[in-house]
Amino acid sequence: MPHKRTTRLVAALTLGVALTACTGNTPQNTQSGDKGGVKVANDEPGKKVVIGFSAPAADHGWMAAITNAAKAEAGKYSDVELRVVEGTNDVNLQISQVETFINDKVDAIVLLPFDGAALTPVALKAMKAGITVINVDRQFDSPFAARSTVLGDNHGMGVSAGTYICEKLKGRSDAVVAEIAGIDSLPLTQDRSKGFAEALANCGLKVSNRVAAEFTVESGEKAAANLLQAARKIDAIWNHDDDQGVGVTAAIKNSGRSEFFMVGGAGSANVMREIKADNGSHKATVVYPSTQGADGIRLARLAVQGKSLGDLVEVEVPRQVELYAPVVTKENVDRYLPTAFES
Amino acid sequence: MSEDTAVTPTNRPVPVKESQSTVSALLSSAAGRNTGLVVALVLLCLAGVVTAGDRFADVDNVLTILRLAAVIGVVSVGMTFVITGGGIDLSVGAIVALSSVWATTLATQGLANSTHWIVMVFTALAVGGACGLVNGVLIAYGRVVAFIATLASLAAARGLAEIISNRKTQIVNVPGFAAFFDASVLGVPVLVVIFAVVAAAGWVLLNRTTFGRRTFAVGGNPEAARLAGIDVRRHTVLLYTLLGLCCGLAAVMLIARTTTGSATHGGLYELDAIAAVVIGGTLLSGGRGTIAGTVFGVLIFTTLSNVFTLNNLSISAQAVAKGAIIVVAVLLQQRLARRSGV
């Protein structure tokens, strides 16, 4: 168990705090042994911590995995009492859920807001009430609204996917690269696309065809079917999201095309299994950790109990933790499969 | 033809002759229905107290319930008028979104900062009212079935909201606006006060004015209403405009609550509002409506949601409970309607 945790906390993390700028994301492995003692100290039951957890509706696999992973993580600690409320895409309702946590005088709130800006006022209210707020994935628009923030690296996902495709298509400046984006309105989608375009530009490639889906299987099928009609020949496709990827794969099967390879996004278990078996168009996927909520639970517990993050010298929990977006291929898939989500 | 659209109830026309006697029967049965709602709400509160104890009966928790109810409550009061008048509006959530976006554009906020924050309120009301007006005109004069016309508005208004906001969340930086709506009057949050005022005004308008009587007449039997000299088309337009204004006001409240305007605001509010109106005892076919019932309907749903939250209950159980409540309410309604109608 300590090893698994180390993998998640250290290996797959980029710490976006100034004080860790010197360490960066270099400690990839080899650390589980000597730091074990620190972790055990942190795991010792401390004072009881009541944590409220609220996230958007679990309408796709990744989002469902966020809540499930958070629940599982809280279950590991005898000193954590987790209160999970109904996932909702209605900001009005989510605000009232946080208000309920404030009324209950919980010790900490782990919040993945449907809309970061819309939940900022109530998060500020919670912080003013002395509650430790941990912001997950979608950022508030005020630095005072959260004690600490756990983020995935959307721009980095695009960079990782683009860099991988560049390597695979080395020297082919006429290659056709297609992109199937997620919900285009979300800043996260714009960040992913920006990183992707930048990485491709680095090796003289560009996105020839771009379509957008909505993270759902149905929308993925529709977008991919259109894309395959629009482009007669494709060399590589990056699909932002493995949940919609189920639909994308179905559309590709229907078309009978196989001249290209695919790179997924987010990192679902079924795509990783396909990569491992090497029997489909997916040759790689880029991880957007679905364990962010679980990391939020851990940070909340540490912050409330006044403990530090084990592998840092600093005695306080960092302000911001930005997770890394690694490329998963056949070679390293076994490392990421255990924390992948089921879509 | 507005008659045709407004009248889903052709299968169950209210005979003109009996209207007098039905009115009195209505009053008594409406009171009866409200008693049922009060009982349901009391049972829910009991369940809350038993399962969550002090956490439920706390003043702060009651205010949390009321704040949650306020936004959807204002929309539901407006929806009560439209449904009582024999119509339906599926576009309310989209209108809330569009109003919230329009009232928070940089241009509007700039104007609000250089003049007064009330500009944002008027913008939201104007946008909501205009959307309602368009709906009403389409339905009354364009002879488009209400279901279709407002379905079209749903798509168009949300699309327009996305275009205006460029699908981004617009953050409000108008200090006076936030300060006003965050305040409390004698310990009651302003948002809750607004809901109470709207509900009271709605009750007076529906039960104590010519406008209200015409609404019942138009919803009950548009043809008879027309023969009685009521301008059914004009009245239909007014009803939808009124609902649009309510949506604009709800948008203002949502902006205050979230400090943002967004094209994603108000998602599925049409279903929540229609559900609250229907379990409140307003007939979907028109001709009967009760503001008090609607307020109880809203409170029942929000209290339910609160009790589930307090008890840490699963994500899906609440939806099942909501569905069950709606079915029971409609079944009850049908029985009451059969008893008094035939």
Q: Predicted regions span which residues?
A:
Chain A
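Hinge/cleft segment of the Venus flytrap/periplasmic-binding protein
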Residues: A11, T23-G24, Q31-V49, I180, ...
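C-terminal motif of bacterial Sec signal peptides marking the signal peptidase cleavage site
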Residues: A18-A21
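Extracytoplasmic "Venus flytrap"
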Residues: G33-Y77, L82-T100, V106, L112-G116, ...
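An alpha-beta-alpha
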Residues: A55-D59, A70, V159-L205, N209-R210, ...
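Structural motif
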Residues: L82-K105, N209-A231, G245
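Hydrophobic alpha-helical segments within soluble ligand-binding/sensing domains
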Residues: Q94, V150-A175, S219-E221, G267-M272, ...
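Hydrophobic alpha-helical
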Residues: L111-K128, F196, A213-R273
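Flexible loop/hinge segments that line or gate small-molecule binding clefts
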Residues: A117-G156, V176, A269-S281
